[in-house]
């Protein structure tokens, strides 16, 4: 009745302890859409999750208002929360959507 996502924590004796950058081979990028960035950051911090800096907000271009910040899962996986409070810029020119956060 909806999407499902599994994230695993693996261990091994020869495990590297440095997580890959998003731009590295084998890197990853997983983002979660949030309606309220401040509330989402507070939720993560209240749970003891390390938020990597302050949220970044675009103030011009077609991405005006887009806000994002990375955080670290307890097992070292870098994840992101993102918000588009004014929608995405391309949406003004077409009825097509890349994705819809309601689903």
What are these regions (language model features)?
Residues 27-28:
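Eukaryotic phosphotyrosine signaling hubs
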Residues 1:
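Short, structured active-site "lid" loops
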Residues 5, 32, 38-103:
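Vicinal oxygen chelate
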Residues 9:
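Pocket-edge structural micro-motifs
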Residues 20-22:
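Short consensus segments that form the blades of beta-propeller domains
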Residues 13-14:
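Amide-forming acyltransferase catalytic core, primarily the GNAT-like/NAT-type
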């Amino acid at each position: 009745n909806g999407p499902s996502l599994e994230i695993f924590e693996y261990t091994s004796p020869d495990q590297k302890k440095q997580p890959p950058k998003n731009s590295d081979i084998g890197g990853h990028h997983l983002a979660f859409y949030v309606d309220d960035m401040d509330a989402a950051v507070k939720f993560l911090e209240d749970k003891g999750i390390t938020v990597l800096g302050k949220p970044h907000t675009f103030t011009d271009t077609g991405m005006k208002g887009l806000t994002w910040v990375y955080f670290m899962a307890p097992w070292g996986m870098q994840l992101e929360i993102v918000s588009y409070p004014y929608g995405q810029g391309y949406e003004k020119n077409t009825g097509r959507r890349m994705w819809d956060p309601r689903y």
